[in-house]
């Protein structure tokens, strides 16, 4: 793997799950986002969205978020705005049976707030727009697992 996704090889993907089972396919999809053309990247992001965020969040989601932040700031990635939108999707979804997983996934997105601020000033208008929406979502984020009532 290249320098963009260098930390990905340390993750034990075969031990993690996503919405449809084993997460062994996640690194390949992340690589397609990193180095694929627009069509390949969009297809890979669609898969990642279904697997990691649209239905619920999973342990594989938690491990994927740092790579998504990495992709979002890499100019050579063809669909950075799509990556940013996936981060927002992850922040907006839950996994009630596994509150700790939900909290960790949300925290991984929330911890990238300063990166989202930088992206909100990006030269690419689509990246700026997606990042602006993500910043707003981060700033207004309240969920039971992240902000338990006292």
Predicted regions span which residues?
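HEAT-repeat alpha-solenoid elements in large eukaryotic scaffold proteins
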Residues: 2-7, 37-50, 83-94
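Residue-level detector of extended alpha-helical repeat arrays and alpha-solenoid scaffolds
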Residues: 41, 61, 80-83, 128
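Eukaryote-biased recognition of C-terminal alpha-helical segments
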Residues: 109-113, 117-150
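Short sequence/structural elements of tandem HEAT/ARM alpha-solenoid repeats
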Residues: 59-68, 99-110, 147-149
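Short inter-helical turns and helix N-cap capping residues of alpha-solenoid HEAT/ARM repeat scaffolds
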Residues: 36-37, 41, 75-77, 123-124
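Long, low-complexity, highly charged intrinsically disordered regions
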Residues: 1-36
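Positions within ordered alpha-helical repeat solenoids
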Residues: 50-53, 70, 74, 89-96, ...
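Buried hydrophobic core positions in alpha-solenoid tandem helical repeats
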Residues: 29-30, 67-69, 115-117
């Amino acid at each position: 793997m290249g320098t963009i996704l260098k930390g990905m090889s340390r993750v034990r993907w075969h031990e993690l799950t996503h919405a449809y089972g084993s997460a062994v396919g996640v690194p390949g999809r992340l690589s397609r986002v990193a180095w694929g053309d627009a069509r390949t990247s969009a297809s890979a992001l669609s898969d990642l969205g279904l697997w990691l965020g649209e239905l619920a969040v999973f342990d594989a989601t938690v491990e994927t978020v740092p790579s998504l932040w990495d992709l979002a700031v890499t100019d050579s990635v063809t669909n950075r705005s799509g990556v940013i939108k996936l981060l927002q999707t992850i922040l907006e979804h839950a996994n009630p049976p596994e509150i700790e997983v939900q909290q960790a996934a949300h925290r991984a997105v929330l911890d990238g707030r300063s990166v989202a601020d930088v992206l909100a000033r990006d030269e690419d208008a689509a990246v700026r727009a997606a990042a602006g929406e993500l910043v707003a979502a981060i700033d207004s984020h309240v969920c039971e697992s992240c902000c338990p009532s006292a």
